[in-house]
Structures are given as structure tokens and as C-alpha cells.
Amino acid sequence: MTTNEQKMCGFVGLFDIRQKSDALRTQVLKMSKNIRHRGPDWSGVYCGERAILSHERLSIVDPQSGGQPLFSRDGKLVLAVNGEIYNHREIRDELAGEYDFRTGSDCEVILPLYRKMGVGLLEKISGIFAFALYDIENDEYLIARDPIGVIPLYIGWDRDEQFYVASELKALEGVCTTIQPFLPGHYWSSKEGKMVRWYDRDWFEYDAVKETGADIPALRAALEAAVKRQLMSDVPYGVLLSGGLDSSIISAVARKFADRRVESHDRDRAW
């Protein structure tokens, strides 16, 4: 999506609670208020004995029913996400008959994939994202960030060693005594208790690609496919031009597909 990341959703999470969660709920809501500019359309909160998730939403896909945090049908999983899952329609088709989706949100696919694949879901989804998922029944959580870190994410600990996660640094300031950025292409599972790289490709190393020749047609096809899938939106979108070559090329490609909605596989006209 061509939306500026600073105008996307935001969330604050608290895990490993060692105090009464009711007392901490007010604190987390105050922290979330510091990033409310990221999500003016909806504010939602989950408050449990061992975890709290607060979400500020900017509606792009499924504005009517995609409010967060998202819950699984049985209410045992709760999810807060900032980002977009571009291949959610394909995943929904694959899970037809296996999972009863509650909303049209692109991010809801994370819930059944977690049940089915655990951290393996990260290789299944295509998009830009930062999310925190809490398994209420087992008191376990999973936090993850997209491959190159398009979506911001930070973590921290307070004096009682309670664990926080937030979309912006300022949500953690004044509460956490230790703060650090959450690395791109990594996840943090409560089972492992540390940051683990999940996105690792051989082309990270120059030696693996130094003999690879240029393939202009393949590059063009990949660029057009990337732009097209990121036009997914249930609200009108616009483009800001910086005057550089990259924004001009992306705008030209977007114009090529702008007349039809990618959500309906080009069957319906766009706005």
C-alpha cells in the first residue's frame, strides 16, 4: 500500500504481567494514547491476567468489521497488527472449510495460520507487518516484524521485568527502563525468550549472486506484480510524488492497474 507508514495503525502490548492487570490497564491505555495519531478510526483493548493489548486503527481493508485486537472464533487467541497481508485472499481460499473467519480483515489470516503452523506462518504471509499474538489458554505470545522492517516496532522492560512492545518508541518512554528496536525479519516467542531471525536468504551474501545476470523482463514483471498487489484497499488511495525516478515509475505502474479493483481479481471497477 502506498500509505505512509506513520499514518498506519499502531499498538502497545504488555506481557509477563506480575501485578494486577486492572491497575496496568490504565497505564497501557495512556501509552497507546501517545500513538493515537497512527489510528484515528478505532481504539480497542484486550485486558487479561497475564497480557494486555491496545490497538489504534487506521481503516484500509474491511473498515466496517476489521477492528482490533482480533480474536479467534473460540476466543483463545488475540492479535494486534500494524500492516497489510497482501496474499490474504489466497490464504483464505486455502483455509476454506478449515476456519470460520469472523471479519474481512487481511490480518485475520494470521490467527488460523498460527494454529496450523506456529512461527512457520511467517514464511506463508506476504506483506509488511508488525504484530503481537497472545495465546490466552497457554499464556504464550509471538511477536514478529516483516523482512526488511517497513513497519516500525520496539520492545522494552520495566523495573519489574514486565515485557512491552509498541509501534513507536515514545509509547515506551517513561515506563521502560530498557528499550531496543525490534529487528527486521525477526520474531520473539515466549517459548524461546529471545529474538530469532526468521527471514534469511542466500542472496544476502554477495558471493551467492555475483554470477547472476540481469533479467530486465523478469524485473519488470516482478515490479508490476508487487505494485499491483499493494493496491489492495477498501478506501480510495492517492500517490505523493517526490520528483525522483522511483516514485514516478511506481506511480506509472499503479496507474496501469488503477481502473480495476485487485480485490475482485480485476472484475470490478475501482473508484
Indicate residue ranges for each PLM-predicted region:
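Cysteine-centered catalytic environments shared across enzyme families
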Residues: T2-W271
